[in-house]
C-alpha cells in the first residue's frame, strides 16, 4: 500500500468543554470530510444532552460516526470500539478523516494501536464480582495484576471489573496481554487546552446550557425506562441529576456537583493527554484558532507529499 492510498487521520482531543466538537465541525467542512467520535458515552442511544452529543442539525451538516451505535443497557468494550473505528478509518473514502473526543483510551487504542484482549463481557461473572464491592475488588486486582492496578483508579469500577474479568476467563493478567502495534498511516494529533480558570467558566456555562436544554427530563425518562440502577446513570452529569430526582439533594446542589465533578474530570483528562508528546497544543482562547489549526493541518498534508519530510508515525 503506497502512502498516497493510506488513510490520513487528524485527531482533535483535549479535556471536556474545550470546544473540540465545534472546531472539528468547522474543520471537517473546510476539508470536505467526516467525523469519527471518540467519546465513550456518545456511543449510547438516548444519552444525548448530558453527553453533549452532536445535534441533528450538526449531523446533517457533517456525517458523524460512532455515535448512537448501541443501547443503554449494552456492554460495549474498548476492543469493539477499536475494531469499528479501524474499519471506518480504512474504508471511508475521505482524506483526511477527523477523530474527535475526550476519551483518552479510545484515542490511544487507535493512535498507538493498542493490543486489547478479545474477551467478551460475561454478565454472570460481572454480577458476582460486583456483589463483592469495589473496595474488595480493587484489593483482589492488586494481588492478581499489580501492573494493571497501578493504572486503574481505586474507584474505577468499570476498568476494575474488566481487568478481573479478563484474568478469570483467560487465567492471565490483562496487563500481560496488552501491548502496542501502531498503524502505518499518517496521524496528526491536535490538542485543545486552556487555563483552569477559563475552563472552569466554560464548564459552568456548559452545565447551565445542559440544564436549559432539558437534562433533568432526559435523566427522568432514562430512569423510568431502564431503572435507576442502569450503570450509565452513575456517570458524570447523570448521577447528580439522579440524586436530585430521587430527593437526595436539591437541583442547585446537583448543578454545583456536576460543575465540581466535571472540573475534576477535566483535570484528569488534561493530565492524560499531556503525557503524549505527539500532540500539538493550541490554546482555545487563541485568536484565529480555526485558521491556526487549519494551517497546521495543511502543512502536515503538504509534508506527506514530500519525500524529504518524514511521515508522522507514533512511537
UniProtKB/Swiss-Prot annotation:
Q: Which spans of this chain does the record mark as coiled coil?
A: none
* InterPro entries named in the record: Dimethylallyltransferase, IPT, P-loop_NTPase
Instruction: Report if keyword ATP-binding is assigned.
Output: yes
> Which positions bind ATP?
14-21
The UniProt GO MF terms for this protein read: ATP binding; tRNA dimethylallyltransferase activity
The cofactors required by this protein are: Mg(2+)
Q: Where on this chain does substrate bind?
A: 16-21
Catalytic activity reported:
adenosine(37) in tRNA + dimethylallyl diphosphate = N(6)-dimethylallyladenosine(37) in tRNA + diphosphate
Enzyme class, broadest EC rank: transferase
Annotated site (Interaction with substrate tRNA), which positions?
Answer: 103
Query: What is known about its subunit structure?
Result: Monomer.
Q: What is this protein identified as?
A: tRNA dimethylallyltransferase
* Protein species of origin: Microcystis aeruginosa (strain NIES-843 / IAM M-2473)
Q: Which gene encodes it?
A: miaA
Amino acid at each position: 500500500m503506497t502512502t498516497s492510498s493510506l488513510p490520513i487521520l487528524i485527531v482533535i482531543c483535549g479535556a471536556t468543554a474545550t470546544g473540540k466538537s465545534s472546531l472539528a465541525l468547522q474543520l471537517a467542512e473546510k476539508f470536505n470530510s467526516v467525523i469519527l467520535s471518540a467519546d465513550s458515552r456518545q456511543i449510547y442511544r438516548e444519552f444525548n444532552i448530558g453527553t453533549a452529543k452532536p445535534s441533528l442539525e450538526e449531523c446533517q451538516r457533517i456525517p458523524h460516526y460512532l455515535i448512537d451505535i448501541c443501547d443503554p443497557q449494552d456492554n460495549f468494550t474498548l476492543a469493539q470500539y477499536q475494531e469499528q473505528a479501524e474499519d471506518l478509518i480504512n474504508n471511508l473514502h475521505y482524506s483526511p478523516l477527523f477523530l474527535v473526543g475526550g476519551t483518552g483510551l479510545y484515542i490511544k487504542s487507535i493512535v498507538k494501536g493498542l493490543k486489547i484482549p478479545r474477551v467478551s463481557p460475561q454478565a454472570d461473572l460481572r454480577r458476582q464480582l460486583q456483589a463483592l464491592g469495589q473496595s474488595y475488588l480493587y484489593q483482589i486486582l492488586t494481588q492478581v495484576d499489580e501492573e494493571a492496578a497501578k493504572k486503574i483508579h481505586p474507584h474505577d469500577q468499570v476498568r476494575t471489573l474488566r481487568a478481573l474479568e479478563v484474568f478469570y476467563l483467560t487465567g492471565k493478567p490483562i496487563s500481560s496481554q496488552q501491548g502496542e502495534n501502531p498503524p502505518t498511516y499518517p496521524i496528526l494529533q491536535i490538542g485543545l487546552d486552556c487555563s483552569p480558570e477559563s475552563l472552569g467558566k466554560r464548564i459552568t456555562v456548559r452545565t447551565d446550557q445542559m440544564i436549559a436544554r432539558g437534562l433533568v427530563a432526559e435523566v427522568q425518562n432514562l430512569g423510568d425506562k431502564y431503572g435507576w440502577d442502569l450503570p450509565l446513570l452513575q456517570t458524570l452529569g447523570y448521577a447528580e441529576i439522579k440524586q436530585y430526582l430521587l430527593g437526595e439533594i436539591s437541583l442547585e446542589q446537583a448543578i454545583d456537583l456536576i460543575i465540581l465533578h466535571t472540573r475534576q474530570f477535566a483535570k484528569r483528562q488534561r493530565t492524560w493527554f499531556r503525557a503524549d508528546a505527539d500532540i500539538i497544543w493550541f490554546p482555545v482562547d487563541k485568536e484565529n484558532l480555526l485558521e491556526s489549526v487549519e494551517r497546521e493541518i495543511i502543512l502536515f498534508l503538504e509534508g506527506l507529499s514530500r519525500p524529504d519530510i518524514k511521515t508522522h508515525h507514533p512511537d
